[in-house]
Every structure is written in C-alpha cells, then in structure tokens.
C-alpha cells in the first residue's frame, strides 16, 4: 500500500537506541493532512488524491482556491500536493491522513526544497580545485578555462560555472523511520533531509525499499 504525507521540518536532534548508540534524527511535524480532492480514471484519466496541509488565513486565499476548499467542505490549507494512489477507493474527501499511517522501521523518501546558498563560485558549487595560494600566483579561486578558442568558438552546454546554488527540489532516498509520536503529529527520521527548519517536506514510501 502506498503511503504519503506532507510535513514541516522542525530540526535535528539525536536519540539513543537500546544498545546506547547515538542515532542522528530529523524531527518532522507530519500532518494531519486532509483529502481535498479525489481523482479517478473515469473522470481524470488517472487515480490520485489531492492532500492539504497547514492552516491558512482567509485573506491570503484567492477566490478560485476558496471555492475549491468550499466544494470539498474543508478548511483552508496552505500547501496542496497530489499523490498517485492505486487504492483511491479507500479515501474520501475530508478524510484525515495522520502520521500513524507510517510505522517504525519503514523506509521512506523525503522531498523538499534545498537550502538556498545564493550566487556561488565553482569551488563551493561544483567542488572545483583552487589554484596555488602562495606568493607570486595570480590564480586562486577563478573558474579557469571555459573551453577552447577558435574551435568550437563557444562554451559547451552544461559547463560547470558560477551561479545560483541550492533552492532546488531535492529528494533523499531510503531513510528509516525511527520513532512516531501520533499524539504530537511527530515523526523522527534517521539522518538529514532537504531544506531549512520550518520548510515543507513530503514523506513517501521508498521506491527502492
């Protein structure tokens, strides 16, 4: 059965297992999410559910989106995501998806927007080697050659150059669920996940598990 939930990254901490070993974990406030729309092969050409997460003030929502939530009979939500599901028949509009849909030991993939680093050079962005820092050298952190001169008379596509780093959709695969606290809507995931604290993340079954 496919599982998915939207959450908010709280931060990182560490816990101890029964043998006293330290496990670094990321704390995620996951759900409760509500089913806002149900899509089926008959009406939309595929099976999926649209899920909402996080409360939102009315003044921040435009009229079409307000109508979308009113039609579903659910309160306004900050984030909307769609998940392809094979068992759509098991869901109804208005149903809540809570963190206890996952179990301890489950393998999950976590998606989010990575931390933005702004404009960065090739050393930080692409792990390029720097030049000598000694006296007399005039080449330290510059990008270096960008290609040949008269032939081909251009810089090839995908040349690693300085530019905007981070702030991209990123997925970390095959992480383990270490602990679940349903009463607080908290899930602890082993290791790090993308994005800053308070960033929105999506937790799904691992595709490689």
Curated annotation (Swiss-Prot):
GO biological processes: translation
Gene3D superfamilies according to UniProt: 3.30.160.810, Translation factors
PROSITE patterns linked: RIBOSOMAL_L3 (PS00474)
Assigned keywords, A-Z: Ribonucleoprotein, Ribosomal protein, RNA-binding, rRNA-binding
UniProt GO molecular function: rRNA binding; structural constituent of ribosome
CC per GO annotation: cytosolic large ribosomal subunit
Chain positions covered by the region annotation Disordered: 129-153
SUPFAM superfamilies tied to this protein: Translation proteins
Top-level taxon of the source organism: Bacteria
Signal peptide: none
One matching Pfam family: Ribosomal_L3
Subunit organization: Part of the 50S ribosomal subunit. Forms a cluster with proteins L14 and L19.
Family: Belongs to the universal ribosomal protein uL3 family.
Role summary: One of the primary rRNA binding proteins, it binds directly near the 3'-end of the 23S rRNA, where it nucleates assembly of the 50S subunit.
Protein name, as recorded: Large ribosomal subunit protein uL3
Gene name of this polypeptide: rplC
